Amino acid sequence: KSYLALVGSLGFALSPLVIIWSRTAVSDSLLCGTVGISLLLFWRKFFENKSKNCISPWIFLSLAILTKGPVAAIIVALTLAIFLSTQDDRKRLLLKIKPLQGILITFLVSTPWYLIVFLKEGQSFFDSFFGYHNLQRYTTVVNNHSEPWWFFIFIMTIGSLPFSIFLFHGIFETIKE
């Protein structure tokens, strides 16, 4: 079953929605990439036996924060918290990623850009970027998008054709077993 990762990657990369969305110059793909690499590097750090520095996952988290803002830190923190809550040796695993050192690295890499832009653009940048793009978008309806939460299941199913057919096939096969 070593081919499953390749098939899954190709199914994602060749989905119409991903192809169309990647051509619109929206930073979501870059956010997904940097968050994904950060999480992969954290996972590798959890399970390697060497106890060297843990810098690279934090650098990629910093790049994700530079890409889309604090939402990247929230996504990574929630993912790590959920993962660690399922592990018996969560304290040892948490210490392997050196969270205090990592938060400092993340802060040192991502903060200077935000400070420079804030000094140049002033309060309007803060209000627009943090207030609108990072708070309102995730807590309220913006741009008159009032579709219910399940609407996006439909969009993802259509946007992932023809590969979404295999998802439903897999779900039905699992239920039958």
Where are the predicted features?
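Membrane-integral, polyisoprenol-dependent glycosyltransferases
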Residues: K1-E177
